[in-house]
């Protein structure tokens, strides 16, 4: 099948869903353009910052469009491209966009409270503590993985200490990324003091992007993975503590232009070349490497269809910058359906890169996607080196924009975990743990530790934890909508399905890890071998976290069900 046809069908479905279902949700729940948002009421120059709607959209999209939509869609294609396409469209429209929009809506209607604080208000303090602990652990895993991914992308040296073939490309992309950070601060200061909006801020963004690439192409930084890892963690520390307007928002605004260029380049490549989808339509309900289609397909696709992490961005940062409630639809629902389109494009690029017999191209999903789009740019007459640097930068930016967002969210989750109502008079250890800089340091230290002891051992749990997080958010939205007298029937189908998917995946993972440990012990211990210890560490860590996630998830679901059962519509509670 022609990949262009697939992309066009997806684009029509997603745009139609935004115009019809998204607007229906907005009308059903109630949008008040005249209401003062938390960004206006609680403006503090750090987290609560009134911001133009499209700038908030850029922040939301660039924060949620991380590694997931590309990696997940391509990996899940092992079951065939049709199941992936169907789940991305159905999941994005009725699951992911509803969750993101709902989380943003609930937060804005509650003074910009994060999801943890919303759970305390509508479910209880115990549920809040459990949820915040779950979120903090989840953020640590994401920080470790994405930081390692970024450092590996810019790495110029191989395992033998020699320069790799792509050293100049990687070094140039690294320098471009650093210049992005520098120009983002300059951009933020210009916006703050000169109040640039509309076409003026867009022109400035493009100028700074061009300057970043000019500097990067001429002055590449050749460093190893360890050095880039330190640089990455230093950057995300500042991104987590500095005011949103100074670094995070302007960088997201600039990055969005790159994402748009990447997506447009991929689409134009599909239009001009209209390559055939070489991946098989359907390979069966079981895959030798991944397992059974249910629940693995849903967990693997992850962010391209639905993601709990998105709700943390919606309620943790975006809700504190929305200036007008009418912007919530495009920020919450619109950013998610655009990410679903990115997942479809990634699937089609991988399909175009596959061999005629359906064999997937060599390399990681990111490498497959990067090479595919870079080849389109070269076909348009762009220089090979520039195309490679641009796509390497895009790949790293996908991870970096999610990384700095999750670092801030992890810091906030940690602070909320130990905070009390009267923090102004808090003393001792509680005041220290809730300090912005100290809580950020501990959060990043946890993520950094995971990169050193082997985050890869627990990364397989990311998909399940991410989807479970979305189910917990949906459960909270059910209670919120009921208490405030709003319709919540559209929440039940995705909630029930995601609970079934995530707990099944976690139990399957738990059983697999127990078998791996016991089988290794049965073979190696009698033979006097010492390799069992390594197997136990790798799988034991996953086992502990899987049990912890299941216990936390079940407890939160129990408290949510109890709160929903006891909740009554209170006309005074409507916000």
Task: Please describe what each predicted stretch is.
Residues 125-140, 334-340, 385-387, 416-452:
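Loop-to-transmembrane helix boundary motifs in multi-pass membrane proteins
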Residues 2-19, 76-107, 116, 174-184, ...:
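Extracellular loop-to-transmembrane helix junctions
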Residues 16-30, 134, 171-215, 225-272, ...:
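Membrane-interface loop-to-helix entry segments
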Residues 2, 69-70, 82, 141-163, ...:
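Transmembrane helix-loop junctions in multi-pass membrane proteins
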Residues 23-49, 72-75, 85, 89, ...:
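Flexible loop linkers connecting adjacent transmembrane helices
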């Amino acid at each position: 099948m022609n990949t262009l046809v697939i992309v066009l069908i997806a684009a029509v479905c997603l745009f139609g869903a935004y115009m019809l279902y998204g607007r229906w949700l907005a009308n059903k729940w109630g949008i008040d353009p005249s209401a003062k948002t938390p960004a206006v009421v609680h403006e503090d120059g750090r987290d609560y910052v009134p911001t133009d709607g499209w700038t908030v959209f850029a922040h939301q999209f660039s924060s949620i469009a991380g590694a997931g939509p590309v990696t997940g869609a391509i990996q899940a294609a092992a079951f065939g491209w049709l199941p992936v396409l169907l789940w991305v469209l159905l999941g994005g429209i009725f699951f992911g966009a509803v969750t993101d929009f709902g989380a943003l809506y609930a937060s804005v209607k509650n003074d910009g409270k994060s999801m943890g604080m919303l759970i305390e208000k509508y479910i209880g303090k115990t549920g809040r503590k459990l949820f915040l602990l779950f979120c903090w652990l989840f953020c640590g895993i994401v920080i470790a993985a994405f930081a390692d991914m970024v450092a590996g992308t810019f790495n110029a040296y191989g395992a033998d200490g020699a320069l790799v073939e792509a050293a100049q490309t990687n070094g140039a992309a690294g320098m471009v990324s650093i210049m992005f950070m520098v120009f983002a601060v300059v951009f933020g200061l210009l916006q703050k003091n000169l109040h640039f909006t509309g076409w003026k801020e867009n022109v400035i963004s493009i100028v700074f992007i061009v300057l970043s690439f000019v500097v990067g192409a001429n002055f590449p930084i050749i460093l190893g993975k360890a050095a880039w890892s330190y640089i990455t963690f230093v950057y995300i520390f500042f991104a987590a503590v500095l005011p949103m307007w100074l670094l995070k928002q302007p960088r997201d605004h600039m990055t969005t232009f790159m994402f748009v260029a990447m997506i447009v380049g991929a689409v134009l490549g599909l239009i001009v070349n209209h390559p055939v989808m070489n991946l098989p339509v359907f390979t069966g309900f079981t895959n030798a490497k991944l397992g059974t289609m249910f629940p693995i397909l849903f967990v693997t696709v992850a962010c391209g269809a639905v993601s709990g992490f998105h709700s943390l961005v919606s309620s943790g940062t975006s809700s504190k910058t929305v200036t007008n409630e009418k912007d919530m639809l495009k920020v919450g629902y619109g950013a998610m359906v655009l990410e679903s389109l990115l997942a479809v494009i990634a699937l089609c690029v991988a399909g175009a890169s596959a061999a005629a017999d359906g064999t997937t191209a060599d390399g990681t999903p990111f490498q497959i996607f990067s090479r595919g789009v870079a080849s389109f740019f070269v076909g348009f007459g762009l220089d090979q080196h520039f195309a490679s640097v641009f796509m390497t930068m895009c790949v790293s930016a996908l991870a970096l924009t999610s990384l700095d967002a999750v670092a801030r969210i992890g810091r906030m989750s940690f602070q909320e975990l130990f905070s009390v109502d009267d923090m102004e008079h808090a003393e001792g250890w509680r005041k220290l743990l809730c300090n912005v800089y100290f809580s950020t340091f501990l959060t990043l230290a946890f993520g950094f530790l995971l990169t050193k002891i082997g985050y890869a051992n627990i990364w397989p749990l990311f998909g399940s934890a991410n989807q479970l997080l979305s189910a917990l958010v949906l459960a909270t939205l059910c209670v919120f909508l009921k208490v405030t007298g709003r319709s919540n029937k559209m929440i039940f189908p995705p909630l029930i399905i995601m609970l079934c998917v995530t707990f099944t995946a976690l139990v399957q993972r738990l059983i697999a890890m127990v078998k791996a440990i016991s089988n290794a012990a049965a073979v190696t211990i009698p033979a006097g071998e010492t390799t069992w210890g390594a197997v136990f560490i790798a799988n034991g860590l996953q086992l502990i976290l899987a049990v912890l996630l299941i216990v936390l998830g079940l407890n939160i679901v129990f408290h949510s069900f109890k709160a929903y059962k006891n909740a009554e519509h209170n006309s005074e509670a409507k916000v």
